[in-house]
Amino acid sequence: MKINYLITAAILIGITTSAMAQENQNEYRSIFNKKADQKVDHGGYGAFGVGYTTIDSKDAILLSFKGAWVINHSIALGIAGSGFFNNLSKTPNSDEHYLGGGYGGFYFEPIIFSKSPVHLAFPILIGGGGITTIPHNYWEWDTNIHGYDYDVFFVFEPGVELEFNMVKFFRVAVGASYRFTNGILLNYDVDKEVPIDALDGFNVYLNFKFGKF
């Protein structure tokens, strides 16, 4: 008899435990009414940076900005943009040209182990931009000189960043990315075309981020 009582008690305890677990599993949840350990943390940051790339096989400088909303310390969503110009070695009385312009768009950034002092991020930019050719002597006092040509383009730029948490509100990121475009149609002058893939290429950069991460 005692064995039967023990078996019955064990079955009842098992049923009760299972029911309680099922009740917790099936508990109604909503986006705006969460337990403390389920709440999503929100933050944001602004950033500026400087970088190096090549455009039409010539050295070029990049100046960039970013503004992003940070979700749960692990994903950043926002906007980003960069300005650029190449052919930095100016030769007096030269008929060479700059390529100058900029691009920007939607910015998506997964962040891995954000709270670690050193961690990784994988930024992706999708957007568009514009580019123009500018003669080296454009800035001289000659009102007859103008930029010869311009074009617009689509851009997709994935990258990787090594981030350093300097203090709670400030991070430094060393990054590399690759800029893909749909090509550009430009002429330096009537007899010389800009390569269609002149904008495609690797970038390296240094970013300074300020905000709540």
Regions picked out by a protein language model, each given a short descriptive name:
Residues 47-51, 92, 141-146, 188-191:
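Extracytoplasmic loops and strand-loop junctions of Gram-negative outer membrane beta-barrel proteins
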